[in-house]
């Protein structure tokens, strides 16, 4: 995304510089189009970069959360000697420990993301805090269900109730994980929207006011 945005900005800069002949006097970081509209490139470029950086951080968290769906496919499985997965029921303790580690990393990243949710992204801070709370709720559920989940011989049914969001029974963490998925989807959509809004400023510039003819 960063490379694409940089290419957009550089291309636009080269095109608009050629249109600066005549018209109102511009600041050093502004360029004007032939129709009299002006773009403050430095300001718009910073907005795009900041929005892109924030969205990238959100995407990292989103990827971690969604990775649990893939891990859930390994419930009741082990690696066969031919490289494929084969059945091994009731040995899901290490798998759940791995999921716990992923969610702990999510919680840490959300703490950092919360510090970035300032300025133009302050409106998303509530979402970030809600997602961090959802991650804590999931970790707490794992702790509460330690008798069933905190051992090597975790049954397939208990593992599914913990990390398989499509499972019918979700009383060991899957319900909290489902809420976490929904929340991070919403934040990613909002973050991407901020990027699009910043880019839109390139195509919807502010019109330069012409000098009054009454002087």
UniProtKB/Swiss-Prot annotation:
<feature type="lipid moiety-binding region" description="S-diacylglycerol cysteine">
    <location>
        <position position="19"/>
    </location>
</feature>
<feature type="signal peptide">
    <location>
        <begin position="1"/>
        <end position="18"/>
    </location>
</feature>
<keyword id="KW-0998">Cell outer membrane</keyword>
<keyword id="KW-0614">Plasmid</keyword>
<dbReference type="Pfam" id="PF01441">
    <property type="entry name" value="Lipoprotein_6"/>
</dbReference>
<dbReference type="GO" id="GO:0009279">
    <property type="term" value="C:cell outer membrane"/>
</dbReference>
<keyword id="KW-0732">Signal</keyword>
<feature type="lipid moiety-binding region" description="N-palmitoyl cysteine">
    <location>
        <position position="19"/>
    </location>
</feature>
<dbReference type="InterPro" id="IPR036437">
    <property type="entry name" value="OspC-like_sf"/>
</dbReference>
<comment type="function">
    <text>The Vlp and Vsp proteins are antigenically distinct proteins, only one vlp or vsp gene is transcriptionally active at any one time. Switching between these genes is a mechanism of host immune response evasion.</text>
</comment>
<keyword id="KW-0564">Palmitate</keyword>
<comment type="similarity">
    <text>Belongs to the variable small protein (Vsp) family.</text>
</comment>
<protein>
    <recommendedName>
        <fullName>Variable small protein 13</fullName>
    </recommendedName>
</protein>
<keyword id="KW-0472">Membrane</keyword>
<dbReference type="InterPro" id="IPR001800">
    <property type="entry name" value="Lipoprotein_OspC"/>
</dbReference>
<keyword id="KW-0449">Lipoprotein</keyword>
